[in-house]
């Protein structure tokens, strides 16, 4: 089993992969930055119907389930009153926050006064449920605040992280900061309990780390970035505990060695993805080469030994995660939808750190074949697990008792525009081929990007770039790793270009040029060894 190999190897890791805080340069990396989806309007034969269903079906389903079919909103109402029972699972608060994040993203591209009113009503309930010291978690408020912060597996920081993501999103969408202020009070409460010279804490389900980076970027408060870094550094030192409620499994919780010494993936798949996202975010802002080296090793292990052809990860139902390398059964595959979304999130971050298109290749695979499999074309039925083989008894469901995947999709789909374009000091990057119009500003230059394509059904892409003044940036078009031959032209004239890390690099272009990329979409087989 993989975990036993990890245990046996841990002594050697101290010598073979030794890195320390000295690897931190304390200067942000010169990295690629995504073009936010708020600047991108999608008009695409493949994606537009799905985004329309998100508005008309997915969000209404989530709202109905949260308000009427389950007790999720009622938990906040009861917590505000300080009476009543807690309904559902101890981490159900997170589904409400994720759905609210999805509502915020929807409001950016589809303003809706009624939806905004609904979101404001929810936020009022969150604020009312917050304790005087800033703590907010309906499970412990209703079952006993004396037990809070005693079991690292009870998802307190996980729920807080999703609240922070929702608070940041809603503030960016509407300018309203009521929820953001709730998040700040909760974070300050956590920092009063944990940190250097205080109590140790290893979040049983990662999420808070990447959320704290978003809070830092929104508030520019360095302490939140430092807290994210401290939480990452807590792992692998024997601090994990479930109190008197069970035995802590360091492999399952990614707590077997310090994160800098990680060499291969183990444990719960979604937790791994969120951990790696947090590491990537902190690495970028602190220029931590130790974190980057660890993620290089982990990515190689995930993609070459533990990933399905669909881009799905996590084969085991027992731990919702990983067992041995190459243990990838079809019929019994787990491949949780949330894990595929996590692959998208992590691989985008790796691309931003490196400028290598191999990460977008994996992102695209996980997006189209893993994450999207989790939702019906009607937008109202969902898969939690995504096996590659079925005997006809595996069907999408309206909802789940553990509803992390439906609520995950409610926030992921409307933000799909985040993954199309990126920018760096010297280039504009085109990562995904989706019909859209992008309006962005770089420095003093306004840029209009228009992309026309029938991708993924066809490999032809037409990109028109108009600028308010000359822009001295390269255009970098990703050439997918499945594409063996392609033609590239500007204004109908074929051009030859160099390739760097999987991107066709166009250096000579001017405003209103029409760049055409024609990729051969050929069928090919991908063989797996039987031994």
Question: Which functions belong to the PLM regions below?
Answer:
Residues 7-12:
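Bacterial N-terminal signal peptides
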Residues 483-507, 523:
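Solvent-exposed beta-strand/loop surfaces of large extracellular or lumenal domains
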Residues 24-113, 117, 147-173, 206-223, ...:
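Aromatic (Trp/Tyr) and acidic
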Residues 15-16:
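C-terminal motif of bacterial Sec signal peptides marking the signal peptidase cleavage site
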Residues 142, 146, 154, 180, ...:
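Asp-box/WD-like beta-propeller blade repeats and closely related beta-sheet repeat scaffolds
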Residues 475-476, 507-520:
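C-terminal beta-strand-rich structural cap/linker in extracellular carbohydrate-active enzymes
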Residues 524-529:
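Conserved small/polar residues in nucleotide/adenosyl-binding loops
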Residues 1-4:
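Positively charged n-region of N-terminal signal peptides that target proteins for export
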């Amino acid at each position: 089993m993989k975990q036993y190999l990890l245990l046996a190897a841990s002594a050697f890791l101290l010598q073979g992969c030794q890195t320390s805080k000295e690897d931190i340069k304390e200067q942000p990396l010169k990295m690629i930055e995504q073009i936010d989806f708020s600047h991108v309007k999608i008009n695409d034969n493949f994606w537009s119907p799905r985004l329309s269903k998100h508005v008309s079906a997915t969000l209404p389903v989530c709202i109905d389930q949260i308000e009427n079919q389950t007790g999720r909103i009622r938990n906040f109402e009861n917590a505000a009153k300080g009476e009543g029972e807690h309904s559902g699972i101890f981490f159900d608060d997170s589904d409400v926050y994720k759905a609210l994040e999805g509502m915020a993203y929807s409001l950016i591209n589809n303003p809706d006064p009624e939806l905004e009113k609904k979101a404001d009503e929810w936020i009022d309930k969150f604020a009312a449920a917050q304790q005087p010291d800033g703590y907010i978690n309906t499970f412990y408020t209703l079952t006993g605040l004396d037990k809070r912060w005693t079991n690292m597996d009870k998802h307190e920081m996980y729920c807080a992280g999703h609240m922070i993501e929702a608070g940041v999103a809603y503030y960016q969408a509407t300018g309203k900061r009521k929820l953001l202020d709730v998040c700040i009070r909760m974070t300050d409460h956590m920092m009063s309990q944990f940190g250097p010279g205080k109590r140790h804490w290893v979040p049983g389900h990662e999420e808070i780390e990447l959320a704290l980076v978003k809070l830092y970027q929104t508030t520019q408060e360095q302490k939140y970035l430092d807290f994210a870094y401290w939480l990452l550094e807590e792992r692998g030192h024997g601090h994990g505990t479930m109190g008197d409620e069970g035995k802590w499994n360091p492999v399952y919780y990614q707590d077997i060695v310090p994160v800098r010494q990680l060499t291969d993936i183990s444990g719960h798949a979604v937790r791994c993805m969120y951990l790696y996202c947090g590491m990537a975010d902190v690495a970028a802002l602190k220029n931590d080469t130790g974190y980057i080296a660890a993620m290089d090793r982990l990515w190689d292990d995930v993609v070459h030994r533990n990933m399905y052809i669909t881009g799905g990860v996590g084969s085991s139902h027992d731990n919702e995660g990983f067992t041995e390398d190459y243990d990838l059964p079809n019929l019994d595959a787990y491949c949780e939808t949330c894990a595929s979304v996590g692959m998208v999130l992590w691989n985008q971050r790796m691309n931003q750190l490196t400028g290598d298109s191999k990460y977008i290749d994996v992102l695209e695979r996980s997006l189209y074949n893993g994450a999207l499999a989790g939702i019906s074309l009607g937008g109202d039925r969902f898969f939690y697990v995504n096996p590659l083989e079925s005997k006809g008894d595996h069907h999408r469901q309206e909802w789940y008792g553990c509803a992390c995947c439906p609520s995950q999709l409610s926030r992921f789909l409307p933000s799909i525009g985040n993954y199309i374009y990126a920018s760096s000091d010297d280039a504009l990057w085109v990562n995904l081929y989706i019909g859209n119009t992008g309006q962005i500003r770089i420095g003093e230059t306004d840029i209009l990007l228009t992309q026309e394509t029938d991708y993924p059904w066809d490999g032809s892409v037409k990109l028109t770039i108009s600028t308010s003044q000359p822009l001295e940036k390269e255009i970098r078009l990703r050439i997918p790793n499945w594409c063996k031959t392609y033609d590239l032209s500007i204004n109908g004239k074929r051009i030859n270009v160099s390739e760097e890390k999987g991107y066709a690099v166009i250096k000579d272009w001017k405003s209103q040029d029409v760049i055409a990329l024609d990729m051969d979409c050929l069928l090919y087989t991908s063989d797996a060894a039987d031994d």
